[in-house]
């Protein structure tokens, strides 16, 4: 599973097929960008 938790939201992916590392980094970078 994948959990991304910040001050504004919780993103959870508990599907049996996980996301790639590149997709996870893209999500984190997008969250960081919108926080600026």
From Swiss-Prot:
GO cellular component assignments: cytosol; endoplasmic reticulum; extracellular region
Coiled-coil annotated spans: none
Biological process terms in GO annotation: cell redox homeostasis; cellular response to stress; hydrogen peroxide catabolic process; response to oxidative stress
GO molecular function: thioredoxin peroxidase activity
EC number: 1.11.1.24
Principal location: secreted
UniProt keywords, alphabetically: Antioxidant, Oxidoreductase, Peroxidase, Redox-active center, Secreted
Expression sites by tissue: Venom gland.
Subcellular location: Secreted
EC top class, as a word: oxidoreductase
Catalysed reactions listed for this entry: a hydroperoxide + [thioredoxin]-dithiol = an alcohol + [thioredoxin]-disulfide + H2O
Gene3D superfamilies (alphabetical): Glutaredoxin
Protein origin, superkingdom: Eukaryota
InterPro entries given in the database record: Peroxiredoxin, Thioredoxin-like_sf
Function recorded in the entry: Venom peroxiredoxin enzyme that may play a role as part of a redox pathway leading to the structural/functional diversification of toxins through a disulfide bond engineering mechanism.
Additional record remark: The active site is a conserved redox-active cysteine residue, the peroxidatic cysteine (C(P)), which makes the nucleophilic attack on the peroxide substrate. The peroxide oxidizes the C(P)-SH to cysteine sulfenic acid (C(P)-SOH), which then reacts with another cysteine residue, the resolving cysteine (C(R)), to form a disulfide bridge. The disulfide is subsequently reduced by an appropriate electron donor to complete the catalytic cycle. In this typical 2-Cys peroxiredoxin, C(R) is provided by the other dimeric subunit to form an intersubunit disulfide.
Assembly notes: Homodimer; disulfide-linked, upon oxidation.
Family assignment from sequence similarity: Belongs to the peroxiredoxin family. AhpC/Prx1 subfamily.
Name of the protein this chain belongs to: Peroxiredoxin-4
Organism, as annotated: Crotalus atrox
